[in-house]
Amino acid sequence: MDIIVMPTAAEAELLTARIIADAINAKPFYKLGLATGRTMENVYANLVKMNKAGKVDFSRVISFNLDEYVGLKGTAEKNKDSYRYFMNYHLFNHVNIDKRNTHEIGRAHV
């Protein structure tokens, strides 16, 4: 594994998005493990821009979220505290990913 140090957070976020986009472009049925949180917000924003510009196609990507809260009220998609809501808000609702191919830990499985 290479460790790449970038001069600024913005450059690191853009490079991360480019690495993800390159991986998807090389293998369209790419499987992504996705994280949430502030660190990823700008990475996802860059991926959205790349998708809108036709530089990456999410249509066949399969994603797995790494975490979810236990005991949230209501549906994960509508609860602003859930990671599903976070992913929809920051990425899934803005790119051409098939939401049937987006997966997270279900509350029934925890």
Protein language model features and the residues they cover:
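Ligand-binding beta-strand-loop-alpha-helix segment within the catalytic cores
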Residues: 57-107
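Generic structural signal for well-ordered alpha-helical scaffold segments
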Residues: 17-25, 48, 52, 88-92
